[in-house]
Amino acid sequence: MELYIEKKFLNNFSKDNSGAAIYKIVRKMFIEYGEKRVFIDFNEDEFKGLNSENEVFNLLYNISPPIPVNSIKEHLFSKSNFSQTIVFTNSKEDWFEAAENKGGLCFCFDNYQEKIKEIVDKLHFEIDLSERFKGWEFLNNYSNLKYNQITIIDKYILSGDDLKKVEDNIIPILKKMKQNNNKLNVSFLTGKLVARNLEHLPEKIKEKAKKRCKFISSETKLPLTDIKIILLDNELNFDFHDRIIQTNFSMLECGKGFILKGVNPSNSVIRSETIFRKFTYNRLKNIRKRVNICIEKQYKKQENYELLKKNGTSPNPEFYMFPFSTK
């Protein structure tokens, strides 16, 4: 995670003794969250004063020493990849919209409590599936969150020849979660695309993946190049068992999976949370690492596949990703 914190915001934040719930959440994020990079607009001359006078800066420094930058805005737009980026400034800036369109979250001192409370209120929820599923309208709540990545982890969500379950579930999910004001990459981590008797035929897998991607692209208006299907394998030493839809800042889980329209009630639950709960931040961080390992491995195997194919050697179909080339 990247935190961009303006010095003026930090000074005002450190003086706040209200003990409000959202204040406590943000303070915990600054001080207790691990594996983050923190950028603050300060220089060496200001360091001693901040370290001695600002309690939050002092505590933050002991966990994740901040990186000094000359300008929050300039560093953000020139260096950040907006993978998981949150900005805190003292006043609302005219460049917030541009940063949010890239997938960042932007707050100022006057609105951070209100905006984060709205995110927590809208996106921390549970849905009981012992009652008949009522549809995907609850995903409208995601309009309160900015993100540029959706990863759907479900071994069976794209399996079978019938497109109806994709049309009734995946398409409305993506339509609800799609945000028109920023680029969105969608990845499916799945286990089965073709029947068992075709699993040894890479071209059949590729053909099926293309059909799925093209259908999803045509129905959601997402560019074909922004949709990826990644086949899971058994060599990762990690079991992607539970079904999850994750963004840069949130996790939506359902043990039963996300093929829900028209199916019988069950003992499953849909749970949604964001990184404004530390437990969920840690879970999302760990799973994102595993997803990235999986994707990197698939790219390497993909290169092997092309090389093996040119040499006339039968490739291993367990490792496969579409689009077939990122160049």
PLM feature segments, named:
Residues M1-D128, N140, E167-K327:
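PLD/PLD-like phosphodiesterase catalytic module centered on the HKD motif
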Residues M1-K8, L145-Y156:
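Short hydrophobic beta-strand segments
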Residues I119, Q149-Y156, D161, N180-N185:
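Metal-dependent nuclease catalytic core centered on acidic motifs
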Residues E131-F138:
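A short, well-structured juxtamembrane/interface segment
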Residues S143, L163-V166:
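Hydrophobic alpha-helical segments and helix-packing faces
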Residues S159-D162, N197-E199:
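A generic structural signal for short coil/turn motifs at secondary-structure boundaries
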